[in-house]
UniProtKB/Swiss-Prot annotation:
PROSITE patterns: CYTB_CTER, CYTB_NTER. This is Cytochrome b. It comes from Murexia longicaudata (Short-furred dasyure). Component of the ubiquinol-cytochrome c reductase complex (complex III or cytochrome b-c1 complex) that is part of the mitochondrial respiratory chain. The b-c1 complex mediates electron transfer from ubiquinol to cytochrome c. Contributes to the generation of a proton gradient across the mitochondrial membrane that is then used for ATP synthesis. The keyword Kinase does not apply. Belongs to the cytochrome b family. InterPro entries: Cyt_b/b6_C, Cyt_b/b6_C_sf, Cyt_b/b6_N, Cytb/b6-like_sf, Cytochrome_b, Cytochrome_b_C_euk/bac, Cytochrome_b_N_euk/bac, Di-haem_cyt_TM. Its main location: mitochondrion. The gene is MT-CYB. SUPFAM superfamilies: a domain/subunit of cytochrome bc1 complex (Ubiquinol-cytochrome c reductase) (SSF81648), Transmembrane di-heme cytochromes (SSF81342). It is found in: Mitochondrion inner membrane.
Length: 381
């Protein structure tokens, strides 16, 4: 009898994607983050679905409904903590996944990479609108500050901002539509993730050496399924430790106070995973310039394939590029720290220097390093 998983129309797709998929034999734990992101997405959709059953998207009751979930709903506190900290785990995996792509030259699969950048932007949008929903002080003021950036767009800016708000300020209409966006976007992310995977399966996975692995492939199951299961177990363990022992450590204390349009918090700042971009936004003393720099800090990922100058794909055997890569990582950590600090010296100048070096590293130094390494590899005799 012919194996059903190889003949059934639906099972065949699953078989080619997760069972008989030929995978390079040498991919390391850095290749686990794709499956971890899938696990994060499933956790977020499930916990979000249960939260949506009890949440009300009205300015008068939103804050109370979140308190009601935590106090009165069976395991509501756990569902809420898993959802809030699940977002942090999601972004941690995303940043590591993107970092892996840059280090090992995975961006040369241009279609997969571009869909990945669109996915990153969509997840960031989802997280932003979701952060507004509890209607705490930082939710409200974060929404006010970030949506206000639209008004920097010449000519249509103010109209656009008021269109997004559904009025003349962040209010009931804004909260209702943000809830609608937050509900629909994860399903769009799921669809994009499937497109991302289908493009990846057109070429096959990259590997740490950056060399074509076609001559040495192994089946995905059982070798990488068991490896992914281990990754998911470690992810769940970390998430549970965070959600059970320190659920509020990554949040903002201002969000324990209901939104008050008449009282501005002393330091308005987003969640930790947006701080690097927020620092770049604040480092430019001009509103439109700041907005453009904020957009450029993410959209720069789209041109990374065009900036690849090295003859080798991966950074595994490129020490100069490796050094610059880790300087870039340190730079992003510095930006994250600066984003959480008040706007005063010395933080202003550190933020400006870090923002400048971020763009300098990606646009100038890393392409030059690739060219230098090509030159060093040429025989000199």
């Amino acid at each position: 009898m012919i194996n059903l998983r190889k003949t059934h129309p639906l099972m065949k797709i699953i078989n080619h994607s997760f069972i008989d998929l030929p995978a390079p034999s040498n991919i390391s734990a850095w290749w686990n983050f794709g499956s971890l992101l899938g696990a994060c997405l499933i956790i977020q959709i499930l916990t979000g679905f249960f939260l949506a059953m009890h949440y009300t998207s009205d300015t008068l009751t939103a804050f109370s409904s979140v308190a009601h979930i935590c106090r009165d709903v069976n395991y509501g506190w756990l569902i809420r903590n898993l959802h809030a900290n699940g977002a942090s785990m999601f972004f941690m995996c995303l940043f590591l996944h993107v970092g892996r792509g840059i280090y090992y030259g995975s961006y040369l699969y241009k279609e997969t990479w571009n869909i990945g950048v669109i996915l990153l932007l969509t997840v960031m949008a989802t997280a932003f609108v979701g952060y507004v929903l509890p209607w705490g002080q930082m939710s409200f003021w974060g929404a006010t500050v970030i949506t206000n950036l639209l008004s920097a767009i010449p000519y249509i800016g103010t109209t656009l901002a008021e269109w997004i708000w559904g009025g003349f300020a962040v209010d009931k209409a804004t909260l209702t539509r943000f809830f609608a966006f937050h509900f629909i976007l994860p399903f769009i992310i799921t669809a994009l993730a499937l497109v991302h995977l289908s493009f990846l399966h057109e070429t096959g996975s990259n590997n740490p050496t950056g060399v074509n692995p076609d001559s040495d492939k192994i089946p995905f199951h059982p070798y990488y399924t068991i490896k992914d299961v281990l990754g998911v177990v470690l992810l769940l363990l970390t998430l549970l430790l965070l959600a059970l022992f320190s659920p509020d450590s990554l949040g903002d204390p201002d969000n324990f106070s209901p939104a008050n349009p008449l009282n501005t918090p002393p330091h308005i700042k987003p969640e930790w995973y947006f701080l690097f971009a927020y620092a770049i936004l604040r480092s430019i003393p001009n509103k439109l310039g700041g907005v453009l720099a904020l957009l450029a800090s993410i959209l720069i990922l789209l041109i990374i394939p065009l900036l690849h100058t090295a003859n080798q794909r991966s950074m595994t055997f490129r020490p100069v590029s490796q050094t610059l890569f880790w300087i870039l990582v340190a730079n992003l950590i510095t930006l994250t720290w600066i984003g959480g600090q008040p706007v005063e010296q010395p933080y202003i100048i550190i933020g400006q220097l870090a923002s400048m070096s971020y763009f300098l590293l990606i646009l100038v130094l890393m392409p030059l390093a690739g060219m230098f390494e090509n030159y060093m590899l040429k025989p000199k005799w």
